Amino acid sequence: MLSIIQRVNCAKVVVDNQKVADINKGILALVCVEKEDTQQNFEKMADKIIKYRIFEDDAGKMNLSLVDIDAEIILVPQFTLAADTKKGNRPSFSSGCPPEIAKEKFKEFENIFRRKYNKVQTGIFGADMKVFLTNDGPVTFSFKI
């Protein structure tokens, strides 16, 4: 399981000219499930994202988590994170899941995330999404579990 999280001042996801997710200060998380991912991976990733301290405290130190500041998050399914880019000039997606399995796994991850934290919005799996965000920093982290 892979994720790239970005601290944002605001973010939104648009599909077919319709806004499907919209947050103010929080996190935009690009999320990729892989073939071997299990519920344990989903639990660990959700905990990592929720508890990771990327927001500044009063002293200006990154010491506060999503929970600490009661912020929102958008989970965006992003299969291209699984691309193997080591050879050639075209990405390979051999470690990614077939779409129907990946959709189920992403939904399972979303459900686990929602059980742990309630201020969650999502993009739409398989849709052509337009993702708009204003980075705060920028502050970006990459996770592999």
UniProtKB/Swiss-Prot annotation:
Superkingdom in the source lineage: Bacteria
Pfam families: Tyr_Deacylase
GO annotation, biological process: D-amino acid catabolic process
Subcellular location: Cytoplasm
Signal peptide region: none
Key words, A-Z: Cytoplasm, Hydrolase, RNA-binding, tRNA-binding
Enzyme class: hydrolase
Reactions mediated catalytically: glycyl-tRNA(Ala) + H2O = tRNA(Ala) + glycine + H(+); a D-aminoacyl-tRNA + H2O = a tRNA + a D-alpha-amino acid + H(+)
Placement of sequence motif Gly-cisPro motif, important for rejection of L-amino acids: 137-138
One GO MF term attached to the UniProt entry: tRNA binding
EC number assigned by the record: 3.1.1.96
SUPFAM superfamilies the UniProt entry points to: DTD-like
Any one annotated GO CC term: cytoplasm
Role played: An aminoacyl-tRNA editing enzyme that deacylates mischarged D-aminoacyl-tRNAs. Also deacylates mischarged glycyl-tRNA(Ala), protecting cells against glycine mischarging by AlaRS. Acts via tRNA-based rather than protein-based catalysis; rejects L-amino acids rather than detecting D-amino acids in the active site. By recycling D-aminoacyl-tRNA to D-amino acids and free tRNA molecules, this enzyme counteracts the toxicity associated with the formation of D-aminoacyl-tRNA entities in vivo and helps enforce protein L-homochirality.
Subunit relationships: Homodimer.
Membership in a protein family: Belongs to the DTD family.
Domain-related comment: A Gly-cisPro motif from one monomer fits into the active site of the other monomer to allow specific chiral rejection of L-amino acids.
Protein name: D-aminoacyl-tRNA deacylase
